[in-house]
Every structure is written in C-alpha cells, then in structure tokens.
A protein has these predicted regions:
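Extracellular Cys-Trp
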Residues: 545-557, 575-582, 588-591, 597
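Membrane-proximal extracellular "stem/stalk" segments
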Residues: 512, 535-536, 542-545, 586
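Short cysteine clusters
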Residues: 369, 539, 547
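Charge-rich, intrinsically disordered regulatory segments
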Residues: 515-516
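Disulfide-stabilized extracellular ectodomains of secreted/luminal proteins, especially beta-rich
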Residues: 2-510, 520-523, 531, 536, ...
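Single-pass type I membrane-protein transmembrane alpha-helix
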Residues: 599, 603-616, 620-623
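Short, intrinsically disordered, charge-balanced linker/junction segments flanking boundaries
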Residues: 5-8, 591-607
C-alpha cells in the first residue's frame, strides 16, 4: 500500500487476526451410509471349533492375529487357528489348528487365581523367519514360548521361558517383534506386574538387554501398543502415567520410545546389561485452539505407511478413562518422530519439569547410537563415558512432544471410544486413496475416507452433509456398520466389554477385513457396492473408493480385471448427491440387502427390491410399517422364482419391506380398501380360498419382478 506507514499496516494486520474467531471443535461427521445387524448377519463368523465344548462353554477368548500372505493365524485361549483366506470367501473356518494347554493349573489356583484364568492365553505370535514363528502363552501364570512351523503348525525345538517375553496375565499388554534375529519385547516381567520391561533377547552371542528396573522415570505403569523398526532404531509406542504431570494426579499420556539396534548395554560401572540409548518423548494428538484439547490415551498404531509420499504411522487416541468419551486419529511422519529425539532433555524442578540447558548435556549426546553421528568415534555402547551413561540413566524423558502431521487429527469422534485401527493407503483404482477402518467399543465399525489433501490443510467448500467442521472438508465417514450380535458371539467370562473390537486385519488381495471380538471373528467385504443396485447416482454419490459404476453390470467392487469404461467420483467433483427410487439410501440400516461374499445373491435381490419399488417413506415411517405389516406375502415362492437358495434369508428385514410395499400395490390393483392391511381386510372373509389368494399374490409380484 503506497504511502501508508509500515507500522500502521502491522497494526491493522494484528487487529484483523485478533478479530478472527477461534476455530471450533470439529463436529462429528454424519455417516453417509449406515448398515444394521440385519444386513451383516450373514457375514461369515467363527466362534470355535465344532464339537469343542470348552470353547462353546467359555468362549473363544481372542488374543491376537497375524496375517502371513494368504494365511491368517489367530491366537486365542489354549489354541492357535490357521485360516486360508484364499479359499471360499463365504466361510470362515480354520484349515489347521493346534492345542496348547497348561500343565500346572493347580499351582495357578494356589496363587489365588480363578479357574478361568488358569489357561494358556497365547499373547505372542510373531514371525521368526520365513519358515517359523514364535508363540508365547501365559501358561496358567507361568509363561512359556515355543517355536512352530508356519505351514504345518508343528513344534520345532524345545520350549523356553516366557518371562519378559510374555505377560503372566492375559489382561496385561505385550508387543514383540524380531529384528536382526533378536526378539524385542515390551511387557511386565513378574507375577505382580510391578516390573515393566523393554527387553531384547534370543540374540546370537549376546546377553539379554533390558530397561532400568523399577524406575518411574523410565516406565510408569505402561500399556504397550506397537513396536516397529525404522532406520538404526527400534521404536516402542505406549501409554503410561505421566511422571512429569504427577501434580495433576494420575494422568495418562502417549509416548514413543526408541533404542538403538546396535546397543550392547553400558559399562560394568553404569547401565550394565541395560539400554544406554533408551529415550522417550510424548506423542501429541490434539485439536488446536485457544484451549488445546488433548487425546492422550493411545489405543492403536499402524505399521509404517506411505502418507503423501512420506513414511508415517497413523495412531488412534482416546480421552482419559474418567473423561467424556472421544477418539481421534492422528498421523505422524517418521521424520518428525526422529527429529523429536534431538530436542532438549527434561528434568524436574520442584513440582514442574523443565528443559535441561544444552551446556549441561554431556558429549557424546546421550541416546546416540555408538559408531553413528555424534558418537561416530565410539566403538560400542559400553565405551561411552560414564558421564554420558549417568545422564542417560537419569534423563530418559525429552522435553516437548511429537506433533501430528498437519497439526491436527485426521478424524475425530465424540461420544464414542474407538479401540482398533486398520489403514488402507492404496485404495481406489489408482491406489491413491486412504481409508481408515475404526473399531469401536460398542461393536460398530467406522469406515472413513481420509482427506486427499495434506492433513490440516485449509478446508475446502463442501455441501456434503456432516462434512463441515472437521479437520478437512474432504474427510468423509463413508459407513457406520453394526457388527456385534451378542446372540451369535459368545462372550468369555471376564472379557470386560464383550462388544469391544479387539482386532482388525486387512486382507487387500481378498478385498476384505477380519474383525475380532473376544468371543468371535467376522469376515466382511471392504465395500457393499451391490446395495446401490442399478442406480448410477447412488453408486457415484457414495464416494466409496472400493466401488465403481460399470454400465453393463451396475455398481460393483473395483478389481483389476474389470473392463475399461467404469466411473467413480470419490472427490465429489461431479456434484452427484441424489439416489434412485428403490436404491438403498444413505441411512437405511436395512438397505444392504446382501453382500459380495455370496456370488449372485446381491444383484438378484436388488432386482427384486428395486423393481418392486420399495419407497423410502415406508422403510422409515413407523406408522406406515404398522399399517401394512400384516400382509401375508408368500415369501419363499417369490424368492425361489429367481432360482436361488433363499431359505437362509427369509427372516431379513428387507423381506418385511417387500411384503409391505407389495401389499399396498396389490390392494391398489385389486381395488381393495381398509386400514388393517391385507389380513385385517380379507383374512377373515368367509369362503376366502387361501391357495387362490397366494396364487394371485405370486402372479402379481412375479409380474413386477419380470417387467
């Protein structure tokens, strides 16, 4: 602005910024589609071996699962199950299993444990090499480990102690991973669960290495979530009671810690057989604003993913246990995680923790790897000066925190505790879409299309329902799926919240997801494209990266073998928002009439229901449902007219809707009146022939189906 003094411009800018309203807390996204239990009831599930009375009585007691190519290994109570995911997608039953029961249950009971606790809960299941895996179980509070063949599940070699490699109690956390032939594990190492440990063992020619014992500065009641290697380090993700916030009470915070892969422990004087490189820093997932809102309880962390072309991890966080329920997903670039370990150290000063002045930090800098960077002249970790080792022993915590990519969460949800996270960063025909699958404590699954733009970018204009107010206008809650059915998923005793999702495992080649509860496993497709039937508008407006519109076949799941010419509108650039009459609408919980696991069913059912023209008002208006609910439609005749085995679907809600609408149309065609439904009007008429009535009904509906 020529002629205007610079101070005036600065003052004007400050006034404008001061007048800018604070950014509101992100509103919950409205689900574009909800799928009820009636629609997911036919998904394959597994709750135990046929004839296994123990599992039938006690429940499956799922612990963890591991996918190795097309094989899914599931660890549970006293069993490991192997599922071949390349076989029939309409079933979920193990092709192999092994039984590993404890031998000393009496000693467990003498320690005051309940009978149902004195089993072998298999808590560790990690690949050791291409042919073998390590399994560790609680073994009635006396943990043991065994090596098994991946293919046959045959035991290899002798069993070894599981102490510090597996918890004593199934409720205690554990993460484990083989790196460079060594087992890195993080758990508790004693019966009382007072000795939390980060441990390296089974190293050829090396003594085991562990964290400092009984040190609240190192570990304070940790709950371990993930372990992964990256560069010269191994990273551990966990939550713990914050020692630096003890003045506020028992506050949980998320952490990421790291150790050097070449760490050999300290000198005989300081940190002998203890980590010399152990450092930890806070992991921060928060909503920015005048008053920052933190999600501190770390629940899940993905393996490294490619996010916007950069290595990153995505993590699921929740609010404090005594707080209002809420959850958030944040992404962290691994370069930012690495950089955070170069920050200042923290130490207590009275009731607060403050940064350590740089001139008080010894050299080589504590936490460095021997032979690298500032410690390039140090041959092994035992050669570090005592001053460096003593400082590392007393100062494991770094000041500050790792901030999320974009400065804010990718997705937030209030009123819900989300428990598990799986991520597909290669969704869509071009493999450039990121989809989050989030399991909840109440048994639901959320399917979220993450923002295509850089996280935390300026939200764009969007007129989609529920889009505004979140971290990005392009983040969409595609589906909200109800999965937990207490009548079909037997809950083990002491399972806590039986509806809590305990595990999610993606199987991209099969375009499916395995969902684990304490009492059962479910196998479901990544999409429900068939619910849109022959409605192009509904298919494209769904903005599901797994669904495409093919003129010759309708709305179908994308696969590499599809012919060219399909359409998709994930970005919403076409502005399509309408649906066709009869297509399953966004919030129609029973609109998912079938799914892609049973070939042929989906399209035939949509042909029946779409052409029957079930209007939305009948599916959502209780008065309309009550008005027409008594029409005695001959369900099996009509459904078998499609030459399909429909018997197992006879109780689905869509059949009731078909009865309702067919009854209304039938009444109009034959000029009948009355408000009691077909049965109320004619069912009691003297001399009415039941067979003749069914014949007319069948002929009428068949005509509607064929037209």
């Amino acid at each position: 602005m020529p002629g205007v003094p610079l101070p005036f411009v600065v003052l004007l800018l400050l006034l404008l910024l001061a007048g800018t309203p604070a950014q509101p807390f992100p509103r919950d996204l409205a689900a574009r589609s909800t799928v009820g239990l009636a629609a997911t009831a036919a998904y394959p599930r597994f709750g135990g071996l046929r004839g296994d009375n123990g599992t039938a009585r006690l429940g499956l007691d799922f612990q963890r699962m591991l996918r190795l190519n097309g094989t899914l290994l599931v660890a549970a109570r006293d069993h490991i199950y192997a599922f071949d995911l390349r076989q029939d997608r309409g079933t979920l039953y193990p092709e192999r299993h092994l039984t590993w029961e404890p031998q000393d249950r009496e000693n467990c009971a003498m320690r005051g444990r309940r009978q149902d606790e004195c089993h072998n809960y298999i808590r560790v299941l990690v690949p050791r090499d291409a042919e073998t895996l390590l399994a560790c179980g609680t073994n009635a509070f006396s943990p043991l480990c065994r090596t098994y063949q991946v293919g046959s599940l045959a035991q290899r070699g002798e069993q070894i102690s599981g102490q510090a490699r597996c918890p004593f109690d199934a409720k205690q956390s554990i993460v484990a991973l083989f790196v460079d032939g060594s087992l890195y594990s993080a758990t508790v190492a004693d019966f009382q669960a007072s000795d939390a440990v980060i441990y390296r063992s089974l190293s050829p020619g090396q003594a085991p290495l562990r964290s400092l014992k009984y040190s609240s500065r190192w570990l304070q009641e940790p709950h371990f979530v993930q372990v992964l290697p990256y560069g010269p380090y191994v990273y551990f993700f966990f939550r713990e009671v914050a020692v630096e916030l003890s003045a506020l009470g028992k506050v949980l915070v998320a952490r990421v810690a790291r150790v050097c892969r070449n760490d050999r422990g300290g000198s005989p004087r300081v940190l002998e057989r203890r980590w010399t490189s152990f450092l930890k820093v806070r992991l921060q997932c928060s909503v920015p604003g005048d008053s920052v809102f933190y999600f501190d309880v770390l629940e899940a962390v993905t393996p490294p993913q490619s996010l916007h072309g950069r290595p990153a991890v995505l993590a699921l966080f929740g609010t404090q246990p005594n707080s209002i329920p809420g959850s958030a997903v944040c992404a962290f670039y691994l370069a930012d995680v690495e950089r955070s370990f170069e920050g200042p150290f923290a130490e207590p000063r009275g009731a607060t923790w403050t940064p350590v002045p740089e001139d008080r930090v010894p050299q080589p800098r504590p936490g460095c790897c021997a032979g690298m960077g500032p410690a390039a002249g140090v041959v092994t970790s035992g050669d570090f000066p005592d001053e460096t080792l003593l400082f590392a022993k007393e100062h494991p915590l770094l000041h500050g925190a790792v901030r999320p990519a974009g400065g804010r969460p990718l997705f937030t949800r209030t009123g819900t505790r989300l428990t598990q996270l799986a991520v597909d960063t290669g969704a869509g025909p071009r493999g450039n879409q990121t989809v989050l699958f989030l399991g909840a404590e109440d048994g639901r699954l959320l399917k979220v299309l993450a923002a295509a733009q850089h996280p935390g970018g300026t939200p764009g204009d969007s007129r989609e329902p529920g889009d505004s107010g979140n971290s990005s206008a392009r983040t969409l809650l595609l589906e909200e799926i109800s999965l937990y059915d207490p009548g079909r998923c037997h809950s083990p005793r002491g399972a806590g919240v039986p509806s809590r999702v305990l595990g999610l495992e993606l199987h991209p080649p099969g375009r499916e997801l395995i969902v684990a509860f304490a009492g059962c496993l479910l196998r479901l497709p990544l999409s429900r494209c068939g619910r849109h039937g022959s409605c192009q508008g509904s298919c494209l407006a769904a903005r599901d990266p797994y669904c495409v519109w093919l003129p010759s076949r309708g709305c179908v799941p994308f696969s590499e073998d599809l012919p060219s010419g399909f359409q998709q509108d994930v970005e919403g650039s076409l502005g399509i928002s309408g649906t066709c009459q009869g297509a399953a609408e966004d919030s129609d919980e029973d609109g998912d009439l079938a799914h892609d696991l049973v070939p042929g069913i989906c399209r035939s059912l949509h042909k029946v229901c779409v052409q029957a023209g079930i209007p939305r008002q009948l599916s959502t208006n209780p008065a309309a449902l009550a008005h027409w609910d008594f029409f005695p439609f001959p369900t099996m005749q009509v459904l078998t007219s499609q030459n399909k085995p429909w018997d197992h679907l006879a109780g689905w809600n869509f059949v009731e809707k078909l009865r309702i609408y067919a009854g209304q149309s039938f009444k109009k065609v034959f000029g009948m009146a009355g408000n009691g439904g077909w049965r109320g009007h004619c069912g009691s008429s003297p001399g009415f022939d039941q067979k003749e009535r069914e014949k007319k009904e069948f002929s009428f509906l068949s005509a509607r189906i064929r037209r």
